[in-house]
């Protein structure tokens, strides 16, 4: 049991946080957040961060560790998460990694590829091409060269589009080839519990309801407070988080309220689609339909079975 790490993964709005808090009442878990949005301070409503009450009942590591103007990489996440896993196990507890940033899960479990360093000449060429042809054109080019990577990133995520094309031009190999290649893996046994709603319409409705709830709770005001406190720019990594970019554009006068709402919901649904694409191909994952009544009971039973078998062996 010393090397056992549980991972609760799933698309946005699938019920991960509530289930994680429930699991802490049954097992000696300590939660590590696997969410590239929740790392940011002052970004609470739009990231669906656990409430103060939930965090009191179930503290989460790797929440509120960066300012919105800072960046945080998959490599930094791996360093932090592996250090926390070692500390948790040393205390006699079990790490429970919870979130939907699948790139972080992938890097942690499969190891990080040694990618080529940034090349200013290639980046300048790509930026010039983007100016003349548009980022949509470059995204379509990436879709042809590396459809696996293109399916995992947003069509407006210019930073990741540029990096994926840069890797291809520098090496002749796709980014997805690097990520799936043989790397040094951490010495842990990962149990992957995946929330995978079978009906996309159910998840889409939950996403719309949650986005409307965020707006009612003061999402727009949260973004205004960020602008007042920090030199917020739309190209910051923190502003790639769904909802924030759309509200920034609304506040800048580019969208009216209803257009912002529609685009925010659409962007969140696209995020869920990419997360489900990752999960669909996740080898060895145990899948649970979170729209089914009693799915949490099934997960609790499975965890208990795994722990009992680990102790007996």
Curated annotation (Swiss-Prot):
Family classification: Belongs to the IPP transferase family.
Could you identify this protein by its name? tRNA dimethylallyltransferase
The role this protein plays is:
Catalyzes the transfer of a dimethylallyl group onto the adenine at position 37 in tRNAs that read codons beginning with uridine, leading to the formation of N6-(dimethylallyl)adenosine (i(6)A).
UniProt GO BP? tRNA modification
A single MF term (Gene Ontology): tRNA dimethylallyltransferase activity
Enzyme Commission number(s) from the entry: 2.5.1.75
Catalyzed chemical reaction(s):
adenosine(37) in tRNA + dimethylallyl diphosphate = N(6)-dimethylallyladenosine(37) in tRNA + diphosphate
Q: Which residues bind substrate?
A: 12-17
What InterPro entries does this protein's entry cite?
Dimethylallyltransferase, IPT, P-loop_NTPase
Q: Which UniProt keywords apply?
A: ATP-binding, Magnesium, Nucleotide-binding, Transferase, tRNA processing
Source organism of this protein record: Legionella pneumophila subsp. pneumophila (strain Philadelphia 1 / ATCC 33152 / DSM 7513)
PANTHER family, per the entry: TRNA DIMETHYLALLYLTRANSFERASE
**Residues that coordinate or bind ATP:** 10-17
| Quaternary structure and interacting proteins, as annotated | Monomer.
